[in-house]
Swiss-Prot record:
Domain of life per record: Viruses
Organism: Latino mammarenavirus (isolate Rat/Bolivia/MARU 1924/1965)
Organism ancestry: Viruses, Riboviria, Orthornavirae, Negarnaviricota, Polyploviricotina
Motif segment (PTAP/PSAP motif): 85-88
RING-type Zn finger ranges: 35-71
Protein name: RING finger protein Z
Amino acid sequence: MGSKQSAPPKPLQLPQPRVSLLREAKPSLYGRYNCKCCWFQDKNLVECSDHYLCLKCISSMLKRGKNCEICGKAIPTYIEVGITPTAPQLN
Protein backbone atom coordinates (compact mmCIF):
# COMPACT_ATOMS: atom_id res chain seq x y z
CA MET A 1 0.00 0.00 0.00
CA GLY A 2 2.60 2.54 1.02
CA SER A 3 5.66 3.39 -0.99
CA LYS A 4 7.97 3.62 2.04
CA GLN A 5 10.05 0.68 3.08
CA SER A 6 10.10 -0.24 6.73
CA ALA A 7 13.34 0.40 8.56
CA PRO A 8 15.49 -2.68 9.17
CA PRO A 9 15.38 -3.86 12.78
CA LYS A 10 18.28 -2.72 14.93
CA PRO A 11 20.48 -5.48 16.33
CA LEU A 12 19.92 -6.18 20.00
CA GLN A 13 22.68 -4.84 22.20
CA LEU A 14 23.32 -6.92 25.26
CA PRO A 15 23.82 -4.85 28.40
CA GLN A 16 27.33 -4.64 29.73
CA PRO A 17 27.83 -6.82 32.82
CA ARG A 18 27.82 -5.01 36.14
CA VAL A 19 31.16 -4.52 37.87
CA SER A 20 31.31 -4.33 41.65
CA LEU A 21 32.69 -1.29 43.45
CA LEU A 22 35.37 -2.05 46.05
CA ARG A 23 35.05 0.30 49.02
CA GLU A 24 38.37 -0.84 50.52
CA ALA A 25 41.27 -2.18 48.49
CA LYS A 26 41.97 -5.87 48.89
CA PRO A 27 45.34 -6.66 50.45
CA SER A 28 47.70 -8.64 48.26
CA LEU A 29 51.11 -10.21 48.57
CA TYR A 30 52.80 -7.02 47.37
CA GLY A 31 50.70 -4.51 49.32
CA ARG A 32 47.33 -2.93 48.59
CA TYR A 33 45.76 -2.54 45.19
CA ASN A 34 45.76 1.02 43.82
CA CYS A 35 44.27 2.81 40.84
CA LYS A 36 46.52 2.00 37.89
CA CYS A 37 45.94 5.40 36.29
CA CYS A 38 46.76 7.83 39.12
CA TRP A 39 48.51 5.30 41.47
CA PHE A 40 47.06 7.19 44.45
CA GLN A 41 43.56 6.00 45.28
CA ASP A 42 43.06 2.75 47.16
CA LYS A 43 39.35 3.24 47.98
CA ASN A 44 36.28 3.10 45.74
CA LEU A 45 38.00 1.07 43.03
CA VAL A 46 36.33 -0.50 39.99
CA GLU A 47 37.83 -3.51 38.22
CA CYS A 48 38.62 -2.95 34.54
CA SER A 49 39.68 -6.22 32.85
CA ASP A 50 42.95 -6.95 34.74
CA HIS A 51 43.49 -3.78 36.80
CA TYR A 52 41.62 -1.34 39.05
CA LEU A 53 40.56 2.27 38.39
CA CYS A 54 39.18 4.90 40.77
CA LEU A 55 35.93 6.71 40.01
CA LYS A 56 37.72 9.98 39.23
CA CYS A 57 39.95 8.36 36.60
CA ILE A 58 37.00 6.48 35.08
CA SER A 59 34.99 9.67 34.67
CA SER A 60 37.95 11.52 33.14
CA MET A 61 38.59 8.64 30.71
CA LEU A 62 34.91 8.56 29.71
CA LYS A 63 35.15 12.25 28.76
CA ARG A 64 37.95 11.42 26.32
CA GLY A 65 36.58 8.16 24.89
CA LYS A 66 34.87 4.85 25.57
CA ASN A 67 37.98 2.67 25.82
CA CYS A 68 40.41 2.36 28.70
CA GLU A 69 43.71 4.13 28.04
CA ILE A 70 45.65 1.39 29.88
CA CYS A 71 44.26 -1.87 28.49
CA GLY A 72 42.29 -0.65 25.45
CA LYS A 73 39.08 -2.47 26.41
CA ALA A 74 35.70 -0.87 27.09
CA ILE A 75 35.50 1.12 30.32
CA PRO A 76 32.95 -0.38 32.75
CA THR A 77 29.95 1.93 32.96
CA TYR A 78 27.50 -0.26 34.88
CA ILE A 79 28.69 -0.36 38.48
CA GLU A 80 27.04 -2.39 41.23
CA VAL A 81 27.39 -0.83 44.66
CA GLY A 82 27.29 -3.50 47.34
CA ILE A 83 25.73 -2.87 50.73
CA THR A 84 28.33 -3.00 53.46
CA PRO A 85 27.20 -3.46 57.06
CA THR A 86 27.78 -0.43 59.27
CA ALA A 87 27.19 -2.21 62.56
CA PRO A 88 27.19 -5.81 63.80
CA GLN A 89 23.92 -7.68 63.55
CA LEU A 90 21.82 -8.01 66.69
CA ASN A 91 21.12 -11.54 67.86
